[in-house]
C-alpha cells in the first residue's frame, strides 16, 4: 500500500527536543516501512526516516529564527500534497484540521489522527461541518467532547516495547516530564507527592512565561 504520512512542521521527525506527535509519527512510519508498505513522509528537512522523505521546509519551524508564522508553510505543504494526492492509497494527516477543506472530495482516502485536546467549544462546529472526514482518537476520553464526530477508531499512543523496561524497586522521587500547560495538569503532578512520602522533580517545557502553579515552594525544577 502506498501511504503518505503528513507530519507537523514545527519539529523534526523524530524530534530533536520536545515533540510527542512527531515522535509517534516517526515510530508509526518506520513500522509501516518495516511491514512492507511504500511510505512517504512529508515533514521538515531535518527529519530522519526509513520512509521516503519529502522536505517541506528546510528545518523544524520552531528552530528556524527566520520563521515567525508557521501557517504559510503549512499552506504550501498542503498545496503540494494536493498535487501529489493521486499517487497514494491513503493520506494520513497529523496536523489537526488544516487539510479538511482541500481534501474533502477524497475524504474516503484520508485519515486524521487527533493528537491534541478536543474539549474546546469551537471545535464542535468544525466537526459538524466536516462530518465526512474520518478521524482517529488517541484515547476514548479524547472522543467524549466530540462524541458525534466521524471517528473510525481509537489507537492509543505507543512506543516500541524494547525502549523502556519497568523496574519494581522503590524509587526516591516522582518525576513529571512534559510541557507546562493547563491540559497537562502539572499542578496534579506537583501536588500528589505532597500526599505521599515522595518528593517531586519536574523537567518542564514552556514557550511562554511560566506563572506560579503551586503555592508550594519546595519543588525542584
Describe each PLM feature range.
Residues 1-221:
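Catalytic cores of nucleotide-sugar-dependent glycosyltransferases that transfer UDP/GDP/TDP-activated
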